[in-house]
């Protein structure tokens, strides 16, 4: 028997079947670095329209986690896709380098600043620590395959950036938005500093819940205010609080003007509460609610004088809209030091702050009874005092949501302190910010509503901190009036120039006389530092507007959905305060990573996924594919099992690509390409299918629908190509003469499809796309990442063999396959090439299928096809899912060709090749087979 293997065009490619991503990717990264890939891209896109994705800086502390990986991969996908669309899309990564966590870590090593080590040395150690953290995180981000200007990132601790942060502050001062105030702010007694809204998170906390009686001082006055007051005994207004430690600072009781209040008789006493809360107060405090002896509205009691429960202080009743019937008694004890609503309602009545609590959470020495006590430890002492004064109605433990420091995880207090604020009301800043929201595209669109709701409750932004490691608030204030120096804008620029040369120490070491001259005697340097949210919030000024490769405003900000209250908001407020315009055109948010059960990831639970581990075991491309395949608009589930499924999907895509590549063996596109109009009809369809799909894919990249791209590519590879096209052309590619038009047509189509596919996957499977690009035949003008979307020819809709035609053919093929499988299972046939198929088709379908002539058998992967009219179908013909079609399958009695394995009547008709069919004889030594359709 003759071996005809050498006459076949067997597949061959250097593109490996086994990815070995974990081993191969680091080598690829070295090559990218050696080739200076990022700069190659910049040079290739020089002068093109820009697309700026501005990187929200991660905090320089700790290894990268899965949330970091998601964020950076999404950004990288967008930047690479925009580059493929022809944009110049520089990507400058950044890091947030100041703040409390770095101070805490440095304190553990060198001790407290100003105690164990001087401030300058402490700042130096903080800078060294942050630099080390940046280096570690950078290594992790590079390993993900993220292409960025890693040699020139922005760090908020760079001298130039620190100087520009100070300049940004100067512009905000010059525009009249900075104020100094004595206001309650979130205060960390552990950190000894104020916190911004964005640094606050809510956790469950168990507190004392107490109902306290404030006695009415002048019962005659009360009697006149309450219509038809009855009953007997002293009258008290009942307040409810979960922060007993604030009672020493209590200066008023707030009621709601429109609420109805009732007086209820108790044994020997009368109590006033909101009628809507009477039942719940009764159940909680165990009081008798049966006998109502008086009614009034809140407004009737305005300025009624009450007695503080343990001080001699008189306490007025005031009115406030913040009083509701959600919980409590409808009467709210009011301490302007310890709550923004309390502060605001107190201000309207001329009630100021007392400043009883110091920065460490201790009552000051001047505070009666509680001097030196810590606010966290004083509740029981206060409760005992209330009991001794017969002012405690009820006490119990109460678990509720309470503000905590997001870094130290410790409870916060509201504390009135002298601070610097960006005023949201002065000069109408908040109104302008709200208007600017309209001009931004929010993706998903609920982001706009979230931002608006955040802004509705937006107080003045406290930007000052009492820290060592932070950009200084480089201002001079008058020692007596506390007013800013009249030449502040010019002074800020002088200080910024010094900081640009010597860093923030230039301010801390500065002798005011060097800048102020004789004025120095009247002015003090501000010693506060800036909130780190200000540092990152002004990067639109300190980075985008300072680097020539960027442009303002940015096209896109992309971060987690928690940043509506964080970076998105701080950036918007500062940009409006400085420039009057939003810093971004689009804001895109992604959800948080959760485990397979939807639970938040936690080291203590043990359900975290380490990106380093995934990359070391499965490769970065698998991690990137998981990110792309997941709808990131909501929570993103990840687990070892999910990643293993992703790895399987990756292998299927890789195998399809490899099959394409192996069929390009011996193909030189410069020499062997076939013009689109000269291609075999099925090949034209395959290229047309890719062209139409590419339009969808580019649109999905533009709308950030990456999970849809994954689905479309996966479907294209597995269904359109693997399940239809590649099955059909296998015979043509393997058995026809190497340089025949029909074979070169199939190779041309596959070459174009791979050229398109490699671009489609490059933003997502970057390492794999690079590997494919290296193995592709033909000349290349540069790396895949400098390429643009491939221009693909398309079929005209009036082409008889258009997309609709081949969809019909695919349905017929699927229907025939089901019948073949049934006959194979019942033993009628072996493989499909051992079958002869008779199709009984309606007139319309008959005409369509008949247009393929003899080549219909190659579409159906059988040795012979007979095409007949539907009304000729015998009763035992198989009914199939295609309308107007019945199928009959019989075993072929013809001999099997030793080369193509088709069973044909003409096998043995050639004396020199008795084992071959006629077309194989022609392909081996004749003029070769001719194909037009399949």
UniProtKB/Swiss-Prot annotation:
Give the InterPro entries listed for this entry.
aa-tRNA-synth_I_CS, aa-tRNA-synth_Ia, Anticodon_Ile_BEm, Ile-tRNA-ligase, Ile-tRNA-ligase_type1, Ile-tRNA_ligase, M/V/L/I-tRNA-synth_anticd-bd, Rossmann-like_a/b/a_fold
- Motif: 'HIGH' region; annotated at 58-68
One Pfam family name from the record? tRNA-synt_1
UniProt domain comment: IleRS has two distinct active sites: one for aminoacylation and one for editing. The misactivated valine is translocated from the active site to the editing site, which sterically excludes the correctly activated isoleucine. The single editing site contains two valyl binding pockets, one specific for each substrate (Val-AMP or Val-tRNA(Ile)).
Uppermost EC category: ligase
Q: How is the cofactor bound?
A: Binds 1 zinc ion per subunit.
Q: Which reaction does it catalyse?
A: tRNA(Ile) + L-isoleucine + ATP = L-isoleucyl-tRNA(Ile) + AMP + diphosphate
**Binding residue positions for ATP:** 603
Predominant location: cytoplasm
Q: Which cofactor does it need?
A: Zn(2+)
Q: What is this protein called?
A: Isoleucine--tRNA ligase
HAMAP family annotated for this entry?
Ile_tRNA_synth_type1 (MF_02002)
User: Source organism's superkingdom?
Assistant: Bacteria
The record's listing under SUPFAM superfamilies reads: Anticodon-binding domain of a subclass of class I aminoacyl-tRNA synthetases (SSF47323), Nucleotidylyl transferase (SSF52374), ValRS/IleRS/LeuRS editing domain (SSF50677)
> What EC number(s) does the entry state?
6.1.1.5
Q: Does the keyword Nucleotide-binding apply?
A: yes
